[in-house]
């Protein structure tokens, strides 16, 4: 597939093909070449391919590969839900420079018992990223007046290689209850290739663990899960040299930073009540974070020599660096009740929840901890007006109370109401 270029007009090419399936060798492919703009030299190339095959009636394997190369692509901001918290929001966006991402995966599956689908699998995955990213951060202590977090707002180069090996086991320990257990190792290598600085390379090795139980019955169901997430610091947080592009707002990484771990626990239960199809549900989610990397700002009233960085900070300047802190945890709970209203062909749902967050970080040079209390109440009414027209009416009440050890208090009360129409 070729692209011809003309000087006078910008060119927009769009080619997408559906999955191609070959029954003989179980090969699946999809490919798209999108948005080539002659004026801005924008392009986006994406290729996916997968191969599935069976060696015997119990042994099979899957091979997958994908590549995504783009330049100047219009990306939307994405909230980093695992790194963000109630009082801090992180958004990331790839730059409009060239970005490359390649993923590969190989899986071998062995069915131990075909009657109950008990099986074991071995997975190897690899991911390579090369490009630039922008990170934007906001302090949300006052949700109605968010403040830019300059210490955590920056652009950085990505040249990362991540490899992961896992073993997974799927079985049924009890009747109507399935269990999935997986464990393995993850290796992340960060490289830096910047002309003005020496090359830098660091490798992090961490375990991966996931355990889940799912029970399904006619009138009740429940699930419980634990997962260990791990995050390597980015190159800005690790860079051992000083960035003096602004001599009065210096920035330096910390090569001794540890990778952070997030332990997440989830419990979900639903039960049908009586003969009127009323249902009640409970959701509890908790997490504990270790070695959280946070920014710390040090101020210098007089000219100061920084021996570790071999640099002299001018008077009235500041230095942003990074440290690991301990003590982050949160818990979120929600109770949901649903009931049909047959007279108007509708369903009503009432949801009440409570969230608590304990978040340590630095304000300047001082370590502080913010405690956030977040109760909520939500109403939903789903009406089927006709076979093709549905309307959902909702009303939400939300209260956020944050207080930190610097005696700062924020109280915010929200009330929203709305309606949505669905025409099929």
Where are these regions (language model features)?
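Primarily recognizes Gram-negative and organellar outer-membrane beta-barrels
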Residues: 4-424
